[in-house]
Amino acid sequence: PSDKLHIGHSYTTVACDALARFKRMQGYDVMFLTGTDEHGQKIQDKAADAGVTPKEYVDKIVATVKDLWKLMDISYDRFIRTTDDYHMESCQKIFTKLYEQGDIYKGEYIGHYCKPCESFWTDSQLVDGKCPDCGREVYDAHEEAYFFKTGKYADRLLKLYEENPQFIQPESRKNEMIAFIKQGLQDTCVSRTSVKWGIPVPFDPKHTMYVWVDALSNYISALGYGNEKYDEYSKFWPADLHMVGKEILRFHTILWPAMLMALDLPLPKRVFGHGWLLMN
């Protein structure tokens, strides 16, 4: 989060807490992972506005998050911060592997960027010139960047959805993802030169990793993939469930599975995209 938590954050976490408690009661060995996504332009800019460093800014947010989960008696098993050294080590290894095998390449990004959503968009994807996800203004972006070959995995993703009908739930969300892919899946811009608050690309440090490549990798870095902090990857991966808000379902059901396919790693068994709590 880039600011104080809202009720939507609690919605996701309480739902996961209920599931974790139920599974423990059934005798399962549970890994309930939560944490904070701390990099990106949004946080860099908010820290500058507050007159503090990005790390000082996120440290304050993390303290409030942990206080809230304690108040709500959230029974998480592990809390990961994407600024943790072991996580950054894992991300750099993942990025390097994808680059060395040809799934990441250098190019030039020309398009639009939504800072609140941390999303890249083409002209044809905008709705009335605005972000199709949140409806906010986007700004033009033009910079050298690395790209992940997401489009290479379009057919495999569609096959995944067809052969595993429970992979994306509810059904309506799955249909949205299928439509998104069928309109033409573009490669994903996975680095920035204009954003300094991020994990450096190890072989080209003027670039920082796109926040979503960094954030999604937490699911396996928190288990010890690509680092020596933990040794539970083989025990707890693949995950039985990712529980996410509908606004970030696309990253979890398109970009993340494509990355895992490229890494030749197992996919999570299910991704549930819940709706929003709205106050009119």
Model-predicted segments: where are they?
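N-terminal, positively charged nucleic-acid-binding surface of large information/translation enzymes
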Residues: 1-167
